[in-house]
From Swiss-Prot:
CDD domains listed in its UniProt record: PBP2_phosphate_like_2
Entry keywords, A to Z: Cell membrane, Lipoprotein, Membrane, Palmitate, Phosphate transport, Signal, Transport
Lipid anchor positions (N-palmitoyl cysteine): 21
One GO term (biological process): phosphate ion transport
Self-association state and partner proteins as the record states: The complex is composed of two ATP-binding proteins (PstB), two transmembrane proteins (PstC and PstA) and a solute-binding protein (PstS).
Pfam families (alphabetical): PBP_like_2
Protein name: Phosphate-binding protein PstS
Organism: Staphylococcus epidermidis (strain ATCC 12228 / FDA PCI 1200)
Amino acid sequence: MKKWQLVGTTVLGASVLLGACGGNDGGSGDGKDLKGSAKGEGSSTVAPIVEKLNEKWAKDHKDAKISSGQAGTGAGFQKFIAGETDFSDASRPIKDEEKKKLEDKGIKYHEFKIAQDGVTIAVNKDNDFVKELTKSQLKDIYSGKAKTWKDVNSSWPDKKINAVSPNSSHGTYDFFEEEVMDKQDIKAEKNADTNAIVSSVTKNKEGIGYFGYNFYEQNKDKLKEVKIKDDNGKVTEPTKKTIQNGSYALSRPLFIYAKDKSLKDNKVMSEFMKFVLEDEGKAAEDAGYVASPKKTYKSQLDDLKDFLDKHQKSDKKDDKKSEDK
C-alpha cells in the first residue's frame, strides 16, 4: 500500500459552473484582457477548492472562464482521455491503465499537487462506543465480514452496522480500496453524492462513512470522527497538522492534471494554472482542506514556467523558419 507524505464549503450541485469549454480567444493575459475558456471535470472532493480558486480568479478575469464538473475522479479521467477537457481534478493519482490510454492517444500532461486531505472516518454523533478503529477492523466492516458492531469488538452492541461508501467513480473510493481494503471489494451502500453519505450517517445511529476532511469539518456538529490505530498501536486523527505532515494514517494529496497541449495553446489554461500555484493553498484552506508546504507550490510553478518558456522559444523558432521560407 502506498503512503503519502509531504506532497505537495459550500454544498455544490452536479457541476461547479465557472464558465464554458476549452477555447482561447486571445488577449494579453493581463487581467481583463485575457479572453477564452478552459474546461475541467473530476473529483467532488477537489471541487470546493476549484470553486474558491475561481471566486478569486473571476474578480480580475471576467472574460476568461473556467468550468469544472464534479462527476468523480474516474469519470473526470474518462473525459480527459476522450479529449473533452483541458484539466482533470483528482483525489487520487492517475492509474496505470489511465496513463496507458493517454499515451495511446498521444496526450501528454502535467500533474500538479494542489492541496492535501485526510480521508475521515465518521460515525453518528450518538455513537458512544466507537472511538478508534484499525484498518483491519475497517476492512472487516466494509468487506461485509463484520455485520454487527459486536463482530468488530465483542464489548460493543450486537446491532447491525450501516456502512456507506462513495461509489467507484470517486477517487476517495479508490484510495480507500487501496489503503484499507487491500483490493478486496467494498460491500456497503454506495452513493455518488458525498453529501448523501454524510446525511446517511447523521440519520442512522449505527451509520459509518468516509469522505474528505472538508466534508467532516462542514458537518462535525452532526458527526463523530473516528481515530485510526496502526499496527504498532499508534493512534492518529485527522487535523491540519497531521494531514500536512503525513502522520495521519489516511492522508493523501489532491491533484489537478492539465494537458500539455492546453497549457501550450490555451492562454487561459496556462494562466489559471499559474494562478493556482501562486495561491499557495490559500483557496484549499478557505475550502476546509490543508495547504501543501510552500516549497511544493514553488517547485511546481518553476517547472510550469520552464515548460511554457521552452514552448514559447520553440514557437518563435518555428515562426522564424516559416519567414525564411
